[in-house]
Design a protein with these regions (language model features):
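Bacterial N-terminal signal peptides that target proteins for export
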Residues: 1-9
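Extended terminal accessory/targeting regions
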Residues: 22-132
């Protein structure tokens, strides 16, 4: 059990490190950066993997063009499990709404790199205290 958990954590760490290597000059994996619900943040994503950078000012937790709970890691707004509120998840959320994300996952042609940046936030954000 511990060996499997260790292998899984190693995989996630490698995934987060590899996504930082392929980021554009302005857009980077910010690690796990907690953000507070209700605060104003500037979301950043690049169009079409390494394309033009897009910046959007938004209040964390607000709805945006039909998307809800901007900045909350994971799908939807509710649920029984605690969730993290982070900058990388905000970047991914805004990208998915603006670019009509195909599936929101790592292989999404527009927002896959943002998904990779947010993967460690989703997995470890609550442990790091990013509860909004």
């Amino acid at each position: 059990m511990i060996k499997k958990l260790s292998l899984f954590l190693s995989f996630l760490m490698a995934l987060s490190l590899s996504s930082a290597v392929f980021a554009t000059s302005a857009e980077r994996d910010e690690g796990i950066k907690c953000i507070s619900k209700g605060s104003w943040q500037t979301a950043l994503y690049d169009k079409d993997r390494n394309g033009r950078d897009v910046y959007t000012n938004i209040r964390v937790g607000d709805s945006y063009k039909g998307g809800q709970c901007m900045g909350r890691c994971g799908g939807a707004c509710g649920g029984w499990a605690p969730s993290a509120w982070t900058k990388d998840c905000l970047d991914h959320d805004i990208c998915i709404v603006d670019q009509n994300g195909e599936n929101g996952l790592a292989w999404d042609k527009n927002c896959g790199d943002e998904f990779n940046h947010a993967a460690d936030d989703y997995t470890f954000g609550v442990w790091r205290g990013c509860r909004g």
